[in-house]
Amino acid sequence: MNVKPEEITSIIKKQIESYEHKIQTVDSGTIIQIGDGIARVYGIEDCMEGELLEFPNDVYGMALNLEQDNVGCVLLGPEKGIKEGDVVKRTGRVVEVPVGEALIGRVVNALGQPLDGKGPIKCTQTRAIELEAPGVIERKSVKEPLQTGIKAIDSMVPIGKGQRELIIGDRQIGKTAIAIDTIINQKDKNVKCIYVAIGQKQSTVAHIVNTLTEMGAMDYTIVVSSTASDSAPLQFLSPYSGCSMAEYFMLKGEDVLIIYDDLSKHAVAYRTMSLLLRRPPGREAYPGDVFYIHSRLLERAAKLSDKLGGGSITALPIIETLAGDVTAYIPTNVISITDGQIFLESELFYAGQKPAVNAGISVSRVGGNAQIKAMKQVSGTLRLELAQYRELAAFAQFGSDLDNSSKERLEKGKRLVEILKQDQYKPMPVEKQIIILYAAVNNYLSDIKVSDIRTFEREFLEYVDTHYRDLGQKILDKKELTDDIKGELNTAIQEFKKVFLA
């Protein structure tokens, strides 16, 4: 083989000409302490608050404490294999999650990674998990109703698109059930749903996903899950991740319903992180900014102005109380941030009233504007009548003689309470709610035994479906009870009662 020296020199010359003098700098530091999912890193200059840091073994962390000589980080993965003295690199990015249509029907963790074994999620866009909430000018007042399908809520505590309505109560009395029923009720209503499970048992999340799949609700739902076995930082990040996924749809002009289940565990996860980072504890050992972590999350729920596409995020945060104490730190914080609360009472639940909504202290501060006129017409006196019934029922326990009008009120109250009961996973369309509440409020049920009320309701609605098929559609079209519709309703009730009481 004959190699010419000129060829070699020309190759060397080309290499020298194409050589570019470039210095690559990487801002890095070393771990000086690690444990309990917290790392202290020395030597990272100019680090941002909330910045992603790259640890060995493809694990990332988030910078939270920027101190004079070191940075306190929380790890977003296992700390196994990471030791003191390891090198940590800055990324210059904040925590982001994938967003887009590809997430619908999937179960993901707080970082948007799939948990359901259905393969990778092909999303082309990402979005920062912490973003500023829309300003005053970018918003519109709440005017459109968001139907939950639950009679007690849609009639007395109505929810509008863009509202934040708190669901609060003790453990195991149906808080999640209300949220899941609301998701099921959004079928064919063009509302995307996001269910964020924070610190729940894995079996509970699996059960919820199975229920939603059976009901066909996973076709428009994303489940973001950080279970009890996940680290505190992942539990802390999951609601913000879910909210960023929701904002993607809101900015496209769509309506989104997001459920945070529950923010009590979210606050506990944040308290854990803060105490491990040596931040000073405040009331109930929560850090001083625990109000801000919830307010900045819930303020991102909004009804956008027409200029921005008119999309909305409706948030239903859930808070767990201890022995019905709504005056504790986290419950009072979240009550003051939200636009009303649905209070569930264990006494009502154990007395067989499900959903156990306490009509006296449950309120919706803005939802009344969103309620359709027909529902306002039937539910106007409902809350007052129930309050009077509770008062009378407490008084009647002493066995004193009551006058006839009080007895009538008691009997009507019993029937109203019975009518507001509802089975789980059976949300009711608003027109059917109006029809049955109209019968209850206008004393048509006074001659029916309390024990037969649920049977009457079921059979009467079937009768209306068969013999007055267009009645429900008329109510939806007109959105109010005109004299014609009232006449038709009265006739239908009287006809059916003859058959029912025969």
Curated annotation (Swiss-Prot):
Species this chain originates from: Clostridium novyi (strain NT)
Catalytic activity: ATP + H2O + 4 H(+)(in) = ADP + phosphate + 5 H(+)(out)
Protein name per its UniProtKB record: ATP synthase subunit alpha
EC number per UniProt: 7.1.2.2
Topological type in the membrane: Peripheral membrane protein
Gene Ontology molecular functions: ADP binding; ATP binding; proton-transporting ATP synthase activity, rotational mechanism
Required for activity, annotated site positions: 362
Job description of the protein: Produces ATP from ADP in the presence of a proton gradient across the membrane. The alpha chain is a regulatory subunit.
Ligand binding (ATP): 169-176
CC annotations in GO: plasma membrane; proton-transporting ATP synthase complex
SUPFAM superfamilies xrefs: C-terminal domain of alpha and beta subunits of F1 ATP synthase, N-terminal domain of alpha and beta subunits of F1 ATP synthase, P-loop containing nucleoside triphosphate hydrolases
Subunit note: F-type ATPases have 2 components, CF(1) - the catalytic core - and CF(0) - the membrane proton channel. CF(1) has five subunits: alpha(3), beta(3), gamma(1), delta(1), epsilon(1). CF(0) has three main subunits: a(1), b(2) and c(9-12). The alpha and beta chains form an alternating ring which encloses part of the gamma chain. CF(1) is attached to CF(0) by a central stalk formed by the gamma and epsilon chains, while a peripheral stalk is formed by the delta and b chains.
Subcellular localization: Cell membrane
NCBIfam families linked to this entry: atpA, PRK13343.1
Keyword line: ATP synthesis, ATP-binding, Cell membrane, CF(1), Hydrogen ion transport, Ion transport, Membrane, Nucleotide-binding, Translocase, Transport
Protein family membership: Belongs to the ATPase alpha/beta chains family.
